[in-house]
C-alpha cells in the first residue's frame, strides 16, 4: 500500500502524525499540489476530487480523507488508543475532532482559499472551477481567531484536548495551529494555556514530522 500526499499540507500532516505516534511505516508518494499535479489525469484516477492524502491499498482500492485513513490504520493497530479506549473516551475524542475541524480547520480553509492568489478559481478542493468570495475569507479569519479563545479555555482545565490522555484530537489541534499560521491566525499572550500545551506536544515523536 502507499499514501499519496503533499507533505506540507494540513491533511497529510494529520496522517503523518497519527502514523508516527502509532509507529506505523508506510510508503509515501509525493504529489506536487503547487504545480497542479493533483489535478492531472493520472492522480484524478486515484482520487477524482483531487485532494490529498489518498491511501491506495494493495488490492487497488482507495481511501481518501485524512480521518478515514487514520481510522483504517487504527482498526489494524488499535494501540495506542488515539481515538479513545472506553466508550466515554471515544465519544469525547470524536466530539473534539469534529469541533476542531468545523470551528477551526474549516474557517482557516475558507480564509486561505478565498484570499490566496494560488487558489484563484479553486476556492473549494475540487478540480472544477469555483470562484473566490472575499467575504468568506474575512469571516474565516474571524472564526478561526474566535476558536483560539475557545480551545484555550478548554486547555486551561484539561491536560490534553480530550482530557487526561493524548489523542487524535491533540493531533488535529496541533495541525490546525500550523495551518492557521498560514493566514496569520496565531496564539497571543491571551492564549497561555494553548501556548503551554503546544510546547508539550512539540516534544512528542509525532510532532517531528514538521521537521521534514
Residue map of PLM features:
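A local structural micro-motif
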Residues: 27, 163, 188, 209-210
Amino acid at each position: 500500500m502507499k499514501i499519496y500526499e503533499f507533505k506540507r499540507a494540513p491533511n497529510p500532516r494529520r496522517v503523518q502524525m497519527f502514523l508516527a505516534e502509532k509507529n506505523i511505516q508506510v510508503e509515501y508518494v509525493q504529489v506536487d499540489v503547487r504545480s497542479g499535479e493533483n489535478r492531472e489525469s493520472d492522480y484524478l484516477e486515484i482520487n477524482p476530487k483531487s485532494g490529498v492524502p489518498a491511501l491506495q491499498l494493495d488490492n487497488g482500492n482507495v481511501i481518501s480523507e485524512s480521518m478515514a485513513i487514520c481510522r483504517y490504520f487504527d482498526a489494524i493497530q488499535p494501540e495506542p488508543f488515539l481515538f479513545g479506549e472506553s466508550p466515554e473516551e471515544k465519544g469525547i475524542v470524536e466530539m473534539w475532532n469534529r469541533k476542531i475541524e468545523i470551528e477551526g480547520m474549516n474557517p482557516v480553509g475558507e480564509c486561505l482559499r478565498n484570499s490566496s492568489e494560488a487558489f484563484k478559481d479553486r476556492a473549494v478542493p475540487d478540480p472544477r472551477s469555483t470562484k473566490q468570495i472575499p467575504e468568506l475569507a474575512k469571516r474565516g479569519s474571524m472564526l478561526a481567531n474566535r476558536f483560539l479563545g475557545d480551545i484555550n479555555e478548554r486547555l486551561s482545565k484539561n491536560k490534553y484536548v480530550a482530557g487526561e490522555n493524548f489523542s487524535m484530537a491533540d493531533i488535529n489541534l496541533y495541525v490546525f495551529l500550523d495551518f492557521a499560521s498560514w493566514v496569520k491566525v496565531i496564539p497571543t499572550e491571551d492564549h497561555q494555556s494553548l501556548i503551554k500545551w503546544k510546547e508539550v506536544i512539540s516534544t512528542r515523536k509525532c510532532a517531528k514530522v514538521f521537521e521534514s
